[in-house]
Amino acid sequence: MAGVLGMILAGGEGSRLRPLTESRTKPAVPFGGSYRLIDFALNNFVNADLMRIYVLTQFKSQSLFQHMKKGWNVNGITDRFIDPVPAQMRTGKRWYEGTADAIYQNISFIESTDPEHVCIFGSDHIYKMDIRQMLDFHKKKKAALTVSALRMPAKDASGFGVIEVDEHGKMIGFEEKPSNPKCIPGQPGIALVSMGNYIFEAESLCKELIHDAALEDSSHDFGKDIIPKMFPEGNVYVYDFSTNHIKGEKKEVYWRDVGTIESYWEAHMDLLKKDAPFSLYNRKWPLHTYYPPLPPATFSDSDNGRVQIIDSLVCGGSYIRGSRIEKSVLGFRSNIASACDISESILLGNVKVGKGCVLRRVIVDKGADIAPGTEIGVNLQEDKKRYHVSDEGIVVIPKGERVGY
């Protein structure tokens, strides 16, 4: 896509997703067995033929770098790149202080590539979006800035930027994370919220970033500072995400913020529904990632009974013997011994589960080893003495943990 530069904000610490983010940045957290969270933003860009992309990182980014090197390397293709960019303190000895500051500290990339438009997207949501449709809207409106937005219950909107628009799609109000979100006129209980995805006219973006960087009282954030300053000037528009159409799909648009353990678990359960609202199987919108060279998953009966796999996803290299797996996602190289009963659980890969284990609503991080006969998620009071248990009763086993030994 000529004249367009993509910049993906991938520096999120992800504190609400701990312990899954203890050793990795939030965009590097595995999802859906085969993917990382960053993959969904990257696929939205690549499937829209937007192939000049900088991925701005900051915290604990090594696993993200490794994933991108293996799965997203387009070196050698003229004028196409997907480059991770670590925080380099180009404008002083300081980390990124906000989302706008992250772009400002890398403004040289905008200046050197000289695009007409800059797409700035987040990297920690699960959704599909044909960015070309949002860009067409942005160009048609001749906007300085276009913000993508969706409707959600007002009771859930206080963690987002809440938007007001006129009949032409122009932004006429914006409040970042309000305690009492305003509802859409005529739609009681429903608010219009920012998805954290922006398309800027490049010259306007650079102008606003330079101005904001000089303000000592600014938090240097798009939602808190840039958007509230720009929209009263009258050239900020709002793109309705519900109008976005993905080839090969007839369902309503799907968007999920996976910033908490509960929402992360729920998004996985969405994948396993009979009529899943988010499909991994659309050939017209392929979901690229790094897939290691592994043999197919193997299922075998044992002396303890037949293997049963019900409403589940199982990735390559996995070996399951005589156990029952229901409504669960098993990542690469999951090794499940016989007589186990695993339900509504997520194994992130290279996990060993010994004979006769019971797992209920458990997230097991990579490399964990669970001893035979262990029960997790059955007695939450006991689990809380040893592991992180969310308010909703989801148990999280940390990366590399040896359980029950």
Curated annotation (Swiss-Prot):
Its EC number is 2.7.7.27. Alpha-D-glucose 1-phosphate binds at residues 96, 161, 176-177, 194. GO terms for biological process: glycogen biosynthetic process. Pathway: Glycan biosynthesis; glycogen biosynthesis. GO terms for molecular function: ATP binding; glucose-1-phosphate adenylyltransferase activity. It is an enzyme of class 2 (transferase). It catalyses: alpha-D-glucose 1-phosphate + ATP + H(+) = ADP-alpha-D-glucose + diphosphate. Keywords: ATP-binding, Carbohydrate metabolism, Glycogen biosynthesis, Glycogen metabolism, Nucleotide-binding, Nucleotidyltransferase, Transferase. The keyword Transcription regulation does not apply. Homotetramer. Belongs to the bacterial/plant glucose-1-phosphate adenylyltransferase family. Involved in the biosynthesis of ADP-glucose, a building block required for the elongation reactions to produce glycogen. Catalyzes the reaction between ATP and alpha-D-glucose 1-phosphate (G1P) to produce pyrophosphate and ADP-Glc. This is Glucose-1-phosphate adenylyltransferase. It comes from Aliivibrio fischeri (strain ATCC 700601 / ES114).
